[in-house]
């Protein structure tokens, strides 16, 4: 995100350097590009700020979802006592707390996605992708709740993998959420790039 902000600042600087070299009289928030295009900098800057904040929030959601994969690596494991900081096999089928931790992550994501769909100024396409991710997240939450009905079952290594290990063939809900969040992040980044491009793109003929 720091690199993106730096790129925005550099682009704004380039626009200012190339603008207002003659042409019609402009309002205080307007600049004229070398091709004659008039930009409302206040409006464009506001759009860039909004879409960048949206993309940053999506990145946080993406990071949370991907962290479930790290939790899955601890199924049936414990920290070694030799201070190496690595994991080793432990008593099998004792995963209820691990699954509960993953459930909390997904519950947090639910709240984040509900907030994102309410953001003003984002495109209908982005809202649709947020809703797709939200629906996929709800599906995974339902799987957690279904698994929790049988506490003895959710403890088992193989049952835990079906919920939170994306390499498991039965973890279809998690894989669906992974795909939806990947697509949402890609679309959010493209929206930021498009907003920045408004500063440099030539006027349409």
Curated annotation (Swiss-Prot):
Keywords: Cell outer membrane, Lipoprotein, Membrane, Palmitate, Plasmid, Signal. It is a lipid-anchor. A lipid is attached at residue 19 (N-palmitoyl cysteine). Its main location: membrane. Residues 1-18 form the signal peptide. SUPFAM superfamilies: Outer surface protein C (OspC) (SSF63515). Pfam families: Lipoprotein_6. A lipid is attached at residue 19 (S-diacylglycerol cysteine). GO terms for cellular component: cell outer membrane. It is found in: Cell outer membrane. Gene3D superfamilies: Lipoprotein, type 6. Belongs to the variable small protein (Vsp) family. Genes for both Vlp and Vsp families are on (usually) unnamed linear plasmids in B.hermsii HS1. The Vlp and Vsp proteins are antigenically distinct proteins, only one vlp or vsp gene is transcriptionally active at any one time. Switching between these genes is a mechanism of host immune response evasion. This is Variable small protein 11. It comes from Borrelia hermsii.
């Amino acid at each position: 995100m720091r690199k993106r902000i730096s790129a925005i600042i550099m682009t704004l600087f380039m626009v200012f350097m190339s603008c207002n070299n003659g042409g019609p009289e402009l309002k205080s928030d307007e600049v004229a590009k070398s091709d004659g295009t008039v930009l409302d900098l206040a409006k464009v800057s506001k759009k860039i700020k909004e879409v960048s904040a949206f993309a940053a929030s999506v990145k946080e959601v993406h990071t949370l979802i991907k962290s479930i994969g790290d939790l899955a690596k601890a199924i049936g494991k414990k920290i070694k006592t030799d201070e190496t900081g690595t994991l080793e096999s432990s008593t099998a089928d004792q995963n209820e707390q691990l699954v509960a931790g993953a459930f909390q992550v997904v519950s947090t994501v639910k709240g984040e996605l509900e907030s994102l769909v309410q953001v003003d100024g984002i495109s209908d396409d982005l809202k649709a992708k947020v809703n797709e991710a939200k629906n996929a997240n709800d599906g995974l939450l339902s799987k957690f709740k279904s698994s929790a009905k049988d506490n003895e079952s959710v403890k088992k290594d193989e049952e835990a993998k079906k919920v939170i290990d994306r390499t498991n063939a039965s973890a279809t809900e998690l894989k669906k959420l992974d795909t939806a969040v990947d697509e949402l992040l890609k679309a959010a980044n493209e929206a930021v790039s498009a907003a920045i491009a408004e500063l440099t793109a030539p006027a349409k003929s």
